Design a protein with these regions (language model features):
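Short, hydrophobic alpha-helical packing/hinge segments within bilobed ligand-binding/sensory domains
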Residues: 115-116, 134
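An extracytoplasmic/periplasmic, membrane-proximal ligand-sensing/linker region
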Residues: 139, 162, 187-250
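A ligand-binding cleft/hinge motif common to bilobed small-molecule-binding domains
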Residues: 22-31, 95-99, 126-160
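Paired acidic/hydrophobic, glycine-rich loop segments that form the ligand-binding mouth/hinge
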Residues: 11-17, 125-129, 144-147, 237-238
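Conserved functional loop/turn residues at catalytic and ligand-binding sites
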Residues: 8, 47, 63, 108, ...
Length: 250
């Protein structure tokens, strides 16, 4: 992530920024080798990554309401797997459980694959993970999706209701990816890159391909708009980290 010392801000060095390194990790890890607010210049938003709440196909819950009712009836007897402490998966689940008044035991993993495998194997109960990571398992029948985290249902899984539809109006959480550059890039180059990127993202073929992978194309009209979004995300995720007293373990 530390490109600020070696890369010239001339538009030839670009990178993908994401909600975790740009908005969450600065609040979880005290000794990062970059400053998410000062070291990078925004270009534009690329995609939003919906999260799917998934369980084993053997789980009797038909939807999120059923699942949360069971969790509330058995406090701290069900488990939720995540991709690690302080990850988006962890925080999104924590927010949902708090809103529902349900208590479950957190089981952090080092990634999606093992977390999903243990749900299939019955070692954990549920996980909230990106659609990109879990879509294939859902479509193959190895996992059952009970809810999607975005305000609207997703085209790839039209029968899966949103969290908002199931008792939590306004619920809209997920991860995002965007294009960023080293701080100091000339505004004219910054604006040109944003325009060119948005032209590509308007292509129906590109949008369809990203949709097939489980990502939603969301764009920002200008670098300034993306910068404002990143600032809001930084502050919002920081508040969540503080509310749940999330701290790095390594």
């Amino acid at each position: 992530m530390c490109i600020r010392d070696s890369a010239k801000p001339d538009g030839y060095t670009l990178m993908i920024g994401a909600s975790a390194p740009q908005a969450i990790n600065p609040h979880v890890y005290p000794n990062l080798n970059y400053d998410a607010r000062k070291d990078f210049a925004p270009i534009g938003l690329i995609t939003w990554l919906p999260y799917l709440f998934v369980v084993s196909p053997d789980n009797p819950a038909a939807n999120l309401k059923d699942f949360l009712a069971a969790a509330k009836a058995k406090p701290n007897q069900l488990t939720y797997a995540t991709t690690g402490i302080g990850t988006t998966s962890h925080l999104v689940t924590a927010v949902l459980l708090s809103k529902a008044g349900a208590a479950m035991v957190h089981v952090p993993y080092k990634g999606s694959s093992q977390a999903q495998t243990d749900i299939v194997g019955g070692r954990t109960t549920a996980t909230f993970d990106t659609m990109v990571s879990s879509l294939a398992m859902v479509k193959s029948g190895r996992l059952k999706a009970l809810a999607v985290s975005t305000p609207e249902r997703v085209a790839m899984l039209p029968d899966v209701a949103t969290v908002a539809e199931q008792g939590f109006p306004g619920f809209d959480m997920g991860a995002w990816l965007g294009l960023i550059a080293p701080a100091g890039i000339p505004p004219a180059i910054q604006d040109r890159l944003a325009r060119e990127m948005n032209t590509v993202l308007a292509d129906p073929t590109v949008r369809e391909r990203l949709g097939d992978l489980g990502a939603q194309v969301r764009t920002t009209p200008t670098p300034a708009a993306f910068g404002a979004m990143m600032k809001n995300e930084y502050e919002s995720w920081g508040a969540i980290v503080r509310d749940f007293n999330v701290k790095a373990t390594d």
